[in-house]
């Protein structure tokens, strides 16, 4: 039977929002994040990264660098609290009008948020029930993705979240819940939803 998942954006949700991360050591966890992911692990949730990462399309760095950043993220989560992301999905693509310049990644794709490609692929690969899943992000596009995929959407106030709420970044959104940070989002998830 398909199970639900918690999909997590990366920058501003799991790690500090510092713009495009050119040096691995600049990827630093937001305090309390590892413990929050571990709580989801312990509660039986499938935890999945779902993140737009257009650095390769913009020619800021290679796709291998993105993989290295995700390896570091997994290492930090494990070292801090024994936490695990069960799967990692990201979109390196960006259309030319939006700034994509590297041919292999400069195009429109169903994987780029708020399109549902990453979540649909994860659901297919891991037998997930999107209607019982949650998307946690700090941008309106994360909440739009949740709506488009039929998931619950939680907006965290870390990263760009506060700016989304005040209307100074992206556009207005209607999340199912607004959380101070990932720990508060996980508290809501564990209180209101069941992983099985």
Curated annotation (Swiss-Prot):
**Under which main EC class is this enzyme filed?**
hydrolase
Known catalytic reactions: D-glycero-D-manno-heptose 1,7-bisphosphate + H2O = D-glycero-D-manno-heptose 1-phosphate + phosphate
Q: Which domain of life is it from?
A: Bacteria
Pfam families according to UniProt: Hydrolase_like
Which cysteines are disulphide-bonded?
Answer: none
Site positions per UniProt: Stabilizes the phosphoryl group: 51, 113
GO biological process, alphabetically ordered: carbohydrate metabolic process
Q: Where is this site: Contributes to substrate recognition?
A: 112
User: What UniProt keywords are attached to this protein's entry?
Assistant: Carbohydrate metabolism, Cytoplasm, Hydrolase, Magnesium, Metal-binding, Zinc
Please name the Gene3D superfamilies in this protein's record. HAD superfamily/HAD-like (3.40.50.1000)
Give binding positions for Mg(2+): 9, 11, 138-139
Q: Which NCBIfam families match?
A: HAD-SF-IIIA, Histidinol-ppas
Protein name per its UniProtKB record: D-glycero-D-manno-heptose-1,7-bisphosphate 7-phosphatase
| The organism of origin for this protein | Thermosynechococcus vestitus (strain NIES-2133 / IAM M-273 / BP-1)
Gene that produces this protein: gmhB
């Amino acid at each position: 039977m398909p199970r639900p998942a918690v999909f997590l954006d990366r920058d501003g949700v799991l790690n500090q929002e510092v713009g495009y991360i050119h040096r691995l050591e600049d990827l630093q966890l937001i305090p309390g994040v590892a413990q929050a992911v571990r709580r989801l692990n312990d509660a039986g949730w499938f935890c999945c990264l779902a993140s737009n990462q257009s650095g390769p399309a913009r020619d800021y760095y290679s796709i291998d660098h993105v993989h290295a950043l995700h390896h570091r993220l997994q290492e930090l989560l494990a070292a801090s609290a024994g936490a695990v992301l069960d799967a990692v999905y990201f979109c390196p693509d960006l259309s030319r009008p939006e700034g994509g310049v590297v041919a292999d990644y400069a195009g429109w794709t169903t994987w780029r948020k708020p399109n549902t490609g990453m979540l649909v692929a994860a659901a297919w690969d891991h037998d997930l029930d999107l209607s019982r899943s949650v998307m946690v992000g700090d941008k309106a596009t994360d909440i739009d993705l949740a709506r488009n995929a039929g998931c619950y959407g939680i907006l965290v106030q870390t990263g760009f979240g506060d700016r989304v709420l005040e209307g100074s970044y992206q556009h207005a959104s209607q999340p199912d819940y607004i959380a101070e940070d990932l720990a508060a989002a996980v508290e809501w998830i564990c209180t209101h939803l069941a992983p099985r």
